[in-house]
């Protein structure tokens, strides 16, 4: 739930109750670029792209390392392909411009892949090939 400056406690409680009623678990965050989850997730994925670009490891090994070492159900590069590399680039650009912080600079490889039309699963090619 995104809680604005003028969101009353009553409104917040009603939204939380509705989420619970429809079987969801709500978290509350203030209104900020990327909110809570994407603010953590997207820079992690971007860093995996930097690691791939720098030749630290293959896409397969980076993903396997995060699955095994961090107990993630999917690796960051496979997840980027699922999200869409164009979407990932857009999010990172919003962060970079919104926070004016170099830690949010999109990886050059991400920009190159988007420019080449390699957007992930939706185009059949991203960090992995999907046979479309």
Feature locations, PLM:
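NAD(P)-dependent Rossmann-like dehydrogenase/reductase catalytic/cofactor-binding core
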Residues: 3-31, 35, 49-54, 58-132
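N-terminal alpha-helical segment
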Residues: 44-45
């Amino acid at each position: 739930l995104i809680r604005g400056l003028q969101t009353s406690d009553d409104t917040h409680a009603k939204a939380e109750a509705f989420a619970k009623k429809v079987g969801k678990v709500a978290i509350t965050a203030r209104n900020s670029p990327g909110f809570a989850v994407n603010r953590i997730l997207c820079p992690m994925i971007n860093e995996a792209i930097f690691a791939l670009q720098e030749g630290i490891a293959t896409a397969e090994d980076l993903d396997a390392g995060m699955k095994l070492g961090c107990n993630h159900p999917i690796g960051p590069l496979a997840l980027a392909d699922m999200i869409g590399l164009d979407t990932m680039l857009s999010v990172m650009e919003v962060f970079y411009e919104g926070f004016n912080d170099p830690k949010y600079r999109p990886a050059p490889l991400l920009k190159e892949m988007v420019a080449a039309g390699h957007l992930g699963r939706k185009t059949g090619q991203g960090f992995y090939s999907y046979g479309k």
